[in-house]
Amino acid sequence: MRLFRSLTLLLASLLMTVAAPAAFADDTYQVEMILVRQNAVPAIVSRAAPEDWAAGAQRLGNDSQRTPALNDVVTKLTASGEYTVLMHKAWQQSLGEAPAKVAVSEGQEQFGQFPIEGTLEMKLGRFTDVTADFWVNQIDANGLVTASEHLRQDSHTKNGQLNYLDNGHLALLIKITSLTAPAPREAPEVVPD
């Protein structure tokens, strides 16, 4: 009896050891974001963006960028006249329980600064924790940032859904979709009795 119990405990601990790394392994996700200006809200000009705006963040490489899927949302936002779409990007990256921070930018770089620049930090859990930190910069003829609009927002987002992060004058729409999770099964046409 003791031998059987010992073997059972040994087998259970072995299975937990083998299965545990898979439970905490990073998965591949597609991240898509749309940064907008809300036209009806007065601009809030903040201090100029810091020179080290991307500190600690991984830059998006061309190989990770993907074709955006939310073009219909961009069309509706633009047609409404209530929003100005400033940036629309999509990329693929690994996400897990450890925070992953990426640097995202748009426009011509001048002395390390972009017209639109910022970081997204994401961490998987029950929800995906997102910290968005973006600047929309006014750059003068000498390449110096003279003024910035700033969006800083923390949110718990649901994967696979379009999430709206409101920060007054600027807002961010973000959708994080797993590329490795199994697709949901279709509901049967007829439910058996």
Give residue ranges: language-model regions:
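Charged/polar interaction segments and conserved charged motifs
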Residues: 2, 22-25
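N-terminal signal peptide c-region/cleavage motif recognized by signal peptidases
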Residues: 17-20
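Polar alpha-helical coiled-coil and adjacent low-complexity
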Residues: 167-169
